[in-house]
Amino acid sequence: MLNAGVLTFQEFAMRETLLLSTIHESVLEFLQGRDDVVLFGAQAVNAYVSEPRMTQDIDLLSTDAKNLAEELKSFLSEKFHIAVRIREIRDKGLRIYQVRNEGNRHLIDIRSIIGFPDIEIIEEIQILSPLELIVSKVISFQSRYGKPKSWTDRRDLAVLLLRFPELKEKVAENLHSKNVGDAVLETWAEIARQDFQLEETDEDLSF
C-alpha cells in the first residue's frame, strides 16, 4: 500500500473539498514510469508495510529537482485548479505547497541528488530500497531527536525492522559507508538493541 488514504479530523471539521489523500494519490500516479525521481519517507514506508500511516507531504529524491518541481507545480495546478508555489530551502531542497486563505498546505519536498542509491520498483514507481530507507530513517531520527516528528521516524524504523529483520546487521555497515557522525552510529546502536515485537490484533484496545 502506498497511499494511506486517510481523512484527517481537521479536513472533516473544515469540510475540506480537496483531501490531502486525493492530492497524494495524484502525485503517486504522476510518478509512475519516471526514472528521474525516487520516493522515500513515509509513503515509501507505506509501500513495504501492511499498516500505513498518514503523512502531510510526499518526500522525493530527484536528479533533476528543479524541473521536476515545475512539472509537479503545473500538474497539480491544472488538475485541481489550485494555487501552487515552489519555495527553495537552502541546502535542503525544494518545497511545493498549496496557497490557501486558511493557511498554506505543505504538499511535496524534493531533494536534489546526483545519483540514486539502491531502489525497488513498486507499482511502476521508483522507491528507496528497504535498507536505504531504514538508513535514511536512522539519520532523520537522530537529526530530529527530541522533536515530535522523531517519534514517527522511530515508529517507521520499528515496522521496517519487523518487516525486514535480516537487514538489521547491514545497517551499521551502510551508515559507515556514508561517513555519518558518531551521534548517528550511537543512535543506531541504541535502536539495534531494541527487541521490537509485533502487536496482537486487539492490543490497540489496551489503554
Question: Where are each of the predicted segments found?
Answer:
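Compositionally biased terminal segments of proteins
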Residues: 1-207
